[in-house]
Amino acid sequence: MLKETVDGLNIKPDGVYVDVTFGGGGHSKEILSRLGPEGKLFGFDQDEDAWENALPDERFTLIQENFRYIKRFLRFNGIKKVDGILADLGVSSHQFDVPERGFSTRFDAELDMRMSKKNDLTAFNIVNEYDETNLRRIFAEYGELGNALAIARAIIEAREKEKIVNTEDLKQVLARFLPNNKAHKILAQIYQSIRIEVNQEMDVLKEFLEQSLEVLDQGGRLSVISYHSLEDRLVKRFMKNGLFEGEPEKDFFGRFEVPFKLIGKMIIPSNQEIKINNRARSAKLRIAEKK
C-alpha cells in the first residue's frame, strides 16, 4: 500500500513531511520523488540498522530516535509545523528476517526483541523476571489470549528449573498451548505480547498520536498503517475523536468538536499485494486531515 499511504499525505512540492518509521526507506523514497527542491523530509528510526539505508538527498534528514519524541526532535531541527506525517507501525521486514534480533518464531535466537539496542529491557528479562501478575497482564492485554494465566504459570514453572534463554526454549515451554492447527497463530500472539512490552509500543503510539496534533499544520495529513487490532483501535479512535477514550466536547450547537477530518475509508491491501508480500495481509491504512 505504498502508493495509497503516500497519496494520503496529499504532498505539496514545497512541504515539510515526516516518515516516523523510516526502516528500509521505501516510503521516504516515494515522498522525496514527489517533493520539489524546496521540500523537506525528516525520517525517524530508533533501529541502528536503519542507518545503513540513509538516503543521500539534501532534502532528507534521518533522526535516530524513537518517534515518541517527534515534537522534541523536530523542534531541535528548527521545525514547529509539518504538512504530513506517515507511520507504518509494527516490525520491519529486516527485523523479522535477522535471526539474532529474536523477533521471528522461525529462528532459534536469544530472547531479545528490542527495536533499539539502547533499550535495557529485553524479552529475556520479561520471560525470566516478570511475576505472574505482569506476565498474565501482557498476554491478556497485548496478545488477547484467553488462557493468559495458564501460559504465565507455565513459564514461571519452567524457569524455576532453568533459565529460558532462547526462542527454542520458549517454544518448548509453550508446546502444550500450541495445537497443530493453531500453533503459528497462538505463538505469534505470545511473541507479539512480549515484543509490545519490550518496546512499550502502545505507550509510544499514544504519545506519538497526541504529538501529531501539535506538530501538524492546519490541513496537514496523518497517514497510518497498523497491523493488529490494538494499534488500529487506538488510531481509529484518535482520528475520529482526538481521544483514546470517552467522547469529545460539544460546541455551542451541540456538535462534537473533533480535531481531524477523516479522509476516505480504511484501506486494506489488495489480493495481489498480499500474494507479493504476505506480511501485508493484516495491514490497515487510515488517513486523517487536521482541521
Swiss-Prot record:
Keyword Magnesium: no
Pfam family, one: Methyltransf_5
Domain of life from the UniProt record: Bacteria
Keywords recorded for this protein, A-Z: Cytoplasm, Methyltransferase, rRNA processing, S-adenosyl-L-methionine, Transferase
Location relative to the cell: Cytoplasm
InterPro entries tied to this protein: RsmH, SAM-dep_MeTrfase_MraW_recog, SAM-dependent_MTases_sf
Chain positions recorded as S-adenosyl-L-methionine binding sites: 25-27, 45, 73, 88, 95
Principal localisation: cytoplasm
Reactions it catalyzes: cytidine(1402) in 16S rRNA + S-adenosyl-L-methionine = N(4)-methylcytidine(1402) in 16S rRNA + S-adenosyl-L-homocysteine + H(+)
Gene Ontology MF annotations: rRNA (cytosine-N4-)-methyltransferase activity
Its EC number(s): 2.1.1.199
Regions crossing the membrane: none
Example GO BP: rRNA base methylation
GO CC field: cytoplasm
PANTHER family: 12S RRNA N4-METHYLCYTIDINE METHYLTRANSFERASE (PTHR11265:SF0), S-ADENOSYL-METHYLTRANSFERASE MRAW (PTHR11265)
Chain's role: Specifically methylates the N4 position of cytidine in position 1402 (C1402) of 16S rRNA.
Similarity remark: Belongs to the methyltransferase superfamily. RsmH family.
Protein name: Ribosomal RNA small subunit methyltransferase H
Gene encoding the protein: rsmH
